[in-house]
């Protein structure tokens, strides 16, 4: 699915936005602050699949949801989309969310939706984007960028990353919720080395995958302990002969596999979907 063109039409016609999946290619936990927040060093990229949002600026403030992953999505004030509207002080504007990404899956679906809602409401109100998006969640600032970024601190330190080729990939979620707080509690070592100060450039996905294999997702071991099905997901992805790297994203349970070509990723996705029709499987390109 390709992102729709964003922009406000003349008058008060609806404004469309795209909320891509966020993927942590690496996630190094480097410490923990006195207030409990964990310090991270993560290479973040975004998929070409995601949720779609449409804002009707003149309608009453509200949220409706449809789509293949709509079940269980709250439409009350606890939803980050409505929290984003409140954060900007919006008093009007109905958003319809077409939900394609699994929730609580380690791919930033809620944060990406919130970031897109901020953009749409800010555009409708003629306002600049706020610089305190982190008040809605640690992943919201990087989702506002929506491009390859090195994210550090508690998510507030963002550095653009150049020299990263498009990465054909398969995303797989087994349909198991892995609560993020439980994963962090299961982390045995909370002071781990960061990525190198200077990230290398890569000519091909294979070059990138080789380097990524020397890095980590420190949340993967505790997530696998909390949800052993992640072991099976990673084994299935890595078992494809064309897979360059298999790793978990974020705090799980979504995992990804990297491939050299989109055709290889598509073929792997078809095989995985056939073997596990109950899993969410999606080929994509990460950028």
Curated annotation (Swiss-Prot):
Q: Where does ATP bind?
A: 102-112
As recorded in UniProt, its EC number(s) are: 2.7.1.148
Q: Which InterPro entries match?
A: GHMP_kinase_C_dom, GHMP_kinase_C_sf, GHMP_kinase_N_dom, IspE, Ribosomal_Su5_D2-typ_SF, Ribsml_uS5_D2-typ_fold_subgr
The UniProt catalytic activity note for this protein reads:
4-CDP-2-C-methyl-D-erythritol + ATP = 4-CDP-2-C-methyl-D-erythritol 2-phosphate + ADP + H(+)
Q: In which pathway does it act?
A: Isoprenoid biosynthesis; isopentenyl diphosphate biosynthesis via DXP pathway; isopentenyl diphosphate from 1-deoxy-D-xylulose 5-phosphate: step 3/6
Q: Which residues form the active site?
A: 22, 139
Class in the EC hierarchy, top level? transferase
Which Pfam families does the UniProt record give? Answer: GHMP_kinases_C, GHMP_kinases_N
Keyword tRNA processing part of the UniProt annotation: no
Q: Is the Nucleotide-binding keyword given for this protein?
A: yes
GO BP annotations of the record are: isopentenyl diphosphate biosynthetic process, methylerythritol 4-phosphate pathway; terpenoid biosynthetic process
PANTHER family linked to this entry: 4-DIPHOSPHOCYTIDYL-2-C-METHYL-D-ERYTHRITOL KINASE, CHLOROPLASTIC
Tell me the function of this protein: Catalyzes the phosphorylation of the position 2 hydroxy group of 4-diphosphocytidyl-2C-methyl-D-erythritol.
What is the protein name given in its UniProt record?
A: 4-diphosphocytidyl-2-C-methyl-D-erythritol kinase
Origin organism is Dinoroseobacter shibae (strain DSM 16493 / NCIMB 14021 / DFL 12)
Encoding gene (name): ispE
């Amino acid at each position: 699915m390709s992102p729709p063109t964003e922009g406000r039409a003349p008058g008060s016609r609806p404004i469309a936005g795209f909320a891509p999946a966020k993927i942590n290619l690496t996630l190094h936990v480097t410490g923990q602050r006195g207030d409990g927040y964990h310090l991270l060093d993560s290479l973040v990229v975004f998929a070409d699949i995601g949720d779609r949002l449409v804002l009707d600026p003149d309608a009453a403030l509200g949220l409706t949801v449809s789509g293949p992953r709509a079940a269980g999505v709250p439409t009350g004030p606890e939803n980050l989309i409505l929290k984003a509207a409140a954060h900007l002080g919006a008093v009007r504007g109905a958003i319809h969310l077409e939900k394609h990404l699994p929730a609580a899956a380690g791919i930033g679906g809620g944060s990406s939706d919130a970031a897109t809602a901020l953009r749409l409401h800010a555009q409708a109100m003629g306002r600049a984007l706020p610089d305190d998006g982190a008040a809605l969640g640690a992943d919201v600032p990087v989702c506002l960028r929506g491009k390859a970024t090195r994210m550090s601190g508690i998510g507030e330190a963002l550095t653009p990353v150049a020299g990263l080729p498009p990465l054909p990939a398969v995303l797989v979620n087994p349909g198991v919720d892995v609560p993020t707080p439980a994963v962090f509690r299961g982390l045995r070592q909370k002071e781990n080395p960061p990525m190198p100060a200077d990230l290398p450039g890569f000519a091909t996905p294979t070059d990138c995958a080789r380097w990524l294999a020397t890095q980590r997702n420190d949340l993967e071991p505790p997530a696998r302990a909390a949800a052993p099905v992640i072991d099976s997901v990673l084994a299935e992805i890595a078992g494809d002969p064309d897979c360059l790297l298999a790793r978990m994203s974020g705090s799980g349970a979504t995992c990804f596999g990297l491939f050299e070509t989109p055709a290889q990723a598509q073929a792997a996705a078809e095989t995985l979907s056939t073997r596990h029709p109950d899993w969410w499987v999606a080929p994509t390109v990460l950028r």
